[in-house]
Regions:
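Beta-strand segments within the central parallel beta-sheet cores of soluble alpha/beta enzyme folds
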Residues: 1-3
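Non-catalytic alpha/beta scaffold blocks inside enzyme catalytic domains
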Residues: 6-168
Length: 168
């Protein structure tokens, strides 16, 4: 049972998957936290300004400031407050990528590109519950068709992007 309505929300906080957080619940606005993570990652600095919240992201999409969005592992057209605004923003955005296990979600209606992702039970991983207890999730069945684990989709994209960004 998830108190937040998002089964792995705590895991997202621990890994720094929210726009205002760094891994380990570190605050992106805290200079000491940024320096610690930058040193661990082997980079000089991290941006001082945190990213947009989910609500701010959809506001920026709706007013045309954001021209492309990649949505992974969530269904904001169904789960975020003010669904009318979210759906209007998705309809306005010129390019919407959705990484999702199901093509019938409310958000999928707005996708220009649907990347088939494996669902729970079709991939290995961990889930952190509200008590911060980490559980290993074992793959029970193979993912259908071209569906892959989320990390594999992300790594493949990053490698292709890196190859295109290499100077000639």
């Amino acid at each position: 049972f998830s108190l937040t309505g998002q089964p792995n929300a705590m895991g997202g906080r621990e890994t720094g998957s929210l726009s205002n957080l760094l891994p380990g619940h570190r605050d992106a606005a805290n200079a000491e936290h940024r320096a610690d993570v930058a040193q661990y990652w082997g980079v000089d600095t991290l941006p001082e300004k945190p990213g947009l919240s989910a609500i701010e992201l959809f506001e920026q999409m709706q007013n045309g400031s954001i021209k492309a969005v990649w949505i992974a592992c969530t269904n904001p057209a169904q789960s975020l407050p003010d669904q009318t605004r979210v759906r209007d923003a998705l309809a306005t955005c010129p390019f919407v990528v959705l990484q999702e296990a199901f093509r019938t979600t409310e958000t999928a209606r707005f996708a220009d590109l649907l990347l088939p992702a494996a669902s729970w039970g079709e991939k290995e991983g961990t889930v952190t519950n509200s008590e911060r207890r980490i559980s290993h999730v074992r793959k029970a069945v193979a993912a259908p068709g071209e569906a892959r684990a989320d990390w594999a989709i992300t790594v493949d994209f990053a490698q292709r992007l890196e190859a295109r960004l290499q100077p000639d």
